[in-house]
Amino acid sequence: MAGNGIFISFEGSEGCGKSTQIRRLAAFLQTLGREVLILREPGGTPIGETIRHLLKHDKNAAAMTPEAELLLFAASRAQLVREVIRPALEKGMVVLCDRFLDSTTVYQGVARALDSSDVAAINSFAVGELLPDLTLLLDLDAEEGRRRAASRGEPVDRMEQEDAGFYEAVRRGYLDLAREYPGRITLIDASLDEEGVAALISNKVSLRLEGQAHGVI
């Protein structure tokens, strides 16, 4: 956390409802008088959005190696942290980010099976000392997540084309992270209906904001 701002990241596999819940939380925070900035990864800056297209939609992306993928995600994040996130936090804003470094730890480090120490070093280089004050992990059965994602009827990007085994590994990786960092990562049951998930999130964030007001985070 910097200034009076607070940095909240949302994590989870495909179809878990992150985008919907980010919008709902933003609306809730605005009713409390907080200034909110919504970001996504990769993306959030002109450079980041170019990298996003390359990672997800470029015609040559199918040939991308896991190592190149890791470095591109890190490049987008490094730009986002310095160009957008840190300045917003210094202004006292609440930053809501759709994915952050935990996605890289899980997708590239676990599901792509890259060396965990290499992934950690690259993550650290990209973000410096900046970590989310709170990470909301929307946990959902991998097959249910794939079903929900498919039901949206939207074009499928390169990452969403991975097989069931890939997304089972993603979920396991996230749950391991939640056990490793219980003070930062809060597990949210994304199998609940939209209202139920939103209530869990708003309650958790309200508690964190109260803690911030009393100087305990």
In which residue ranges do the predicted regions lie?
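NTP-dependent small-molecule kinase module
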Residues: A2, A26, E143-I217
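Walker A (P-loop) phosphate-binding loop of P-loop NTPases
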Residues: G15
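ATP-dependent small-molecule kinase phosphotransfer cores
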Residues: R34-V127, L200
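A glycine- and Lys/Arg-enriched "phosphate-lid" helix/loop adjacent to the NTP-binding pocket
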Residues: S103-R172
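Conserved lysine of the Walker
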Residues: K18
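Pre-Walker A (Motif I) flank of P-loop NTPase domains
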Residues: G3-F7
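Hydrophobic positions on the alpha1 helix immediately C-terminal to the Walker A/P-loop
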Residues: Q21
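Hydrophobic anchor at the beta1->P-loop junction of P-loop NTPases
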Residues: F10
